[in-house]
A protein has these predicted regions:
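ABC ATPase NBD coupling module
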Residues: 61-78, 96, 104, 225-231, ...
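ABC ATPase "signature
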Residues: 218-222, 230, 490-491
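Conserved ABC ATPase signature
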Residues: 135-140, 144, 405-409, 413
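Helix-to-loop junction immediately C-terminal to a conserved catalytic motif
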Residues: 40, 44, 316
Length: 530
């Protein structure tokens, strides 16, 4: 397949049997999404199939008419897209959108369609299907929306489901629920599943077969057991080495070495004391307390709605606590005038989750990084220029990047720019809000290594907000587990992960993909079998 003059998929072949699952694994640009679009005949204008064929139940998809394919696509092939927030129309009720899918069933009445929709919602584990039917997408959680999309995909009882990164934005426990749902539907309905992911841990645990792609070429493929236990390509081994769930000591050895170095006992850099916050009748944070030592990394973990985001907003002064106290350095965050707070805020900077949305696409990198200096009135023009160049160099980017716009940068380069923007103020604390969740695994490794280096060189304190517990275990010194706005457990990360006391923490840890269990012939192999 080529887009214009650029070939993006080269001589890729694989077979997927009835009732089996195959994971296409690769980073951005590997060609995995193009393959999915080819199977579904969703290639954009300008794309050309240079050779080969896609055969589905003996039919060459490229050669059948549009009418034949629409019928095939509506009844025999289902698609679960990556982002349910973008896949569903936000201004139309779920039920209205579900009826568009139900029409392919050619039932006798709208009432019958509604009944089938409600039955399908119940089948995919949505409690109170009637409420879901009446709801708008913004009224449902990410996990609920993903279940809706899965329900719409399986409603016509297709023989193939193509799932494009269906769990990439979900909390670890919701991720497990969604993957378990796929397993159950595959088993009960005899579905074949083409699973597209960059997460080798999920693929190894959940798929019967794996195909590893890079730059549009298959690096290797085979059963999950074979590819995972004895990879033959250097690229697959590199992917394995960079996945925290597969290689538990990928970052931990660096982290422990850093912590054994001599360090002055400087006390706490962040001290959160009995903080509470409500929005109307909703208790967002209730009596939350934790402390972070200078130069250390503290993780906040929990599912959506646990209070992580509200806690961060309180720390940054974007919300005011109803009660309690927050101290950063030697200054209290709450109770200050605006001018006093600006002085505190200079030493407390945020790195956002998604570098594809957190950078203004119309600005050049130099302006993006300089913006905090302009906002706080730091230095003259020459000093600001020098500090921007210093920040760019510190994150490992060449200075010529200053003249580029975000569209000309890769995901990893964009996140480095976001980190440079935070560093330009020379802060004491960085709040890292899921800083690697939108990145491929090898790019994630580069960013984590960069953060370790900066912390060691600059003595930074990190507050790391994440739902990736396998990563938290490796990079954090201490951790606070939040549920429904309350602290359920906290302490040294090794202690919490080794012997969690609270059932909620135990459930979170249990939901981490267990890569020691890989699949062969549809059954899960325990560690002793591999």
């Amino acid at each position: 397949v080529a887009y214009g003059d650029q070939q993006v998929v080269d001589n890729i072949s694989f077979a997927l049997g009835r009732g089996e699952s195959l994971a296409l694994i690769g980073e951005s640009g590997s060609g995995k999404t193009t393959i999915a679009r080819t199977v579904l005949r969703l290639l954009p204008k300008g794309a050309t199939i240079l050779g080969g064929e896609v055969s589905f139940d003996g039919k060459n998809i490229a050669r059948i008419s549009d009418r034949e394919f629409r019928e095939l696509r509506g009844t025999q092939m289902g698609f679960v897209p990556q982002d349910p927030g973008n896949a569903l129309n936000p201004v139309r009720r779920i039920g209205v959108q579900a009826h568009e899918t139900a029409r392919v069933l050619k039932l006798r009445s709208r009432a019958e369609e509604r009944q089938r929709i409600l039955e399908t919602f119940e089948e995919v584990g949505l409690s109170d299907p009637a409420r879901i039917y009446r709801s708008y997408p913004y009224e449902l959680s990410g996990g609920m929306l993903q279940r809706v999309l899965i329900g719409l995909a399986v409603m016509p009882r297709p023989s193939l489901i193509v799932a494009d990164e269906p769990t990439s934005g979900l909390d670890v426990t919701i991720q497990k629920v969604v993957l378990d749902l796929f397993e159950e539907l595959k088993r009960s309905l005899g579905l074949s599943l083409l699973f597209i992911t960059h997460d080798l841990a999920i693929a190894a645990e959940r798929a019967d077969h794996l195909a590893v792609l890079k730059d549009g070429v298959v690096q290797e493929q085979g059963s999950s057991r074979t590819v995972f236990a004895a990879p033959t390509s250097d690229y697959t081994r590199e992917l394995q080495a960079d996945v925290p769930a597969i290689n538990p000591d990928r970052y931990r050895s660096i982290h422990l070495a850093r912590n054994t170095a001599e360090r002055n006992a400087l006390g706490n850099q962040i001290d959160v004391q009995s903080v509470s916050k409500t929005f109307g009748d909703v208790v967002a944070v209730a009596d939350v307390s934790f402390a972070v030592q200078r130069g250390k990394t503290h993780a906040l973990v929990g599912e959506s709605g646990s209070g992580k985001t509200t806690t961060v907003r309180l720390l940054l002064g974007l919300e005011h606590a109803d009660s309690g106290k927050i101290v950063v350095g030697d200054a209290a965050v709450n109770g200050h005038s605006r001018s006093q707070w600006r002085s505190v805020r200079r030493h407390l900077q945020l790195v956002y989750q998604n570098p594809f949305t957190s950078l203004d696409p119309t600005w050049r990198v130099g302006k993006i990084v300089r913006e905090p200096l302009d906002r706080f009135g730091v230095g003259d023009k020459d000093e600001r220029r020098d500090r921007v160049a210093e920040a760019i160099r510190s994150v490992g980017l060449p200075e010529e990047m200053i003249a580029r716009k975000p569209a000309k940068l890769s995901g990893g380069q964009r996140q480095r720019v976001a980190i440079a923007r935070a560093l330009v103020m020379r802060p004491d604390v960085l709040v890292l809000d899921e800083p690697t969740s939108a990145l491929d695994v090898t790019v994630q490794a580069e960013i984590i290594d960069l953060l370790f280096r900066l912390q060691s060189e600059l003595g930074l304190t990190y507050l790391f907000v994440s739902h990736d517990l396998s990563l938290v275990r490796q990079i954090a010194d201490t951790v606070t587990v939040l549920q429904d706005g309350r602290v359920v457990e906290q302490g040294p990360v090794e202690k919490i992960f080794a012997s969690p006391a609270d059932p909620y923490t135990q459930a979170l840890l249990k939901a981490i993909p267990a890569v020691s269990r890989v699949r062969e012939n549809g059954r899960v192999l325990e560690p002793a079998t591999v």
